[in-house]
A protein has these predicted regions:
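Short acidic/histidine- and often glycine-rich active-site loop of Leloir-type glycosyltransferases
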Residues: 10, 74-87, 91-92
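Conserved acidic donor-binding segment of nucleotide-sugar-dependent glycosyltransferases
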Residues: 86-87, 91-98, 107-112
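Nucleotide-activated donor-binding/catalytic signature segment of Leloir-type glycosyltransferases, i.e.
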Residues: 9-33
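Short hydrophobic beta-strand element within catalytic cores of glycosyltransferases
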Residues: 62, 67-74, 84
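C-terminal alpha-helical cap of glycosyltransferases
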Residues: 130-141
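Acidic donor-binding loop of glycosyltransferase active sites
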Residues: 39-54, 70
């Protein structure tokens, strides 16, 4: 969902994987439209990279995907690892390496692994609910 400077490389990868009929690149979506796409997705892929000393922080979008039972593939740069449990709820890869992104996508699609990861992701996403976060803060004080 969205665009970026690597969209052409990603489209090339999608063609190599023969996934043109299964992957789309929508942009300018409302929150409801975004959630509708997430609900019917098998995998969420956002391999963040460091760019001019700037990097994705926490990456709430991984948690948003997880709440719908969608596992994620995130980049090792930034905060993806705070929301993705590698090899349990998705994969952390080198977003600068097209081969690593490709391998992560291939691995998660293999033997429908994304379904198992998605169930775990949905369970773990609950720890990020505001009610849980507030409860944890109150326990500290």
């Amino acid at each position: 969902i969205g665009q970026g400077e690597n969209v052409d490389n990603l489209k090339k990868l999608i063609t190599e994987l023969k996934l043109q009929d299964q992957v789309i690149f929508p942009k300018n979506l409302t929150k409801d439209e975004k959630n509708s796409y997430l609900k019917c997705s098998d995998v969420f892929v956002m391999p963040s990279i460091t760019y001019k000393k700037s990097v994705e922080g926490f990456g709430i979008v991984y948690v948003e995907a997880a709440q719908f039972g969608v596992p994620s593939i995130g980049g090792k740069d930034g905060g993806a690892a705070d929301a993705i449990d590698h090899d349990q709820t998705g994969y952390i890869c080198d977003g600068n390496s097209l081969d690593d992104v490709y391998q992560s996508i291939s691995n998660i699609l293999e033997n429908n692994k994304y379904k198992v990861f998605g169930k775990k992701a949905e369970e773990i996403s609950k720890k990020f609910y505001w009610s849980e976060i507030i409860k944890n803060y109150l326990e500290i004080f």
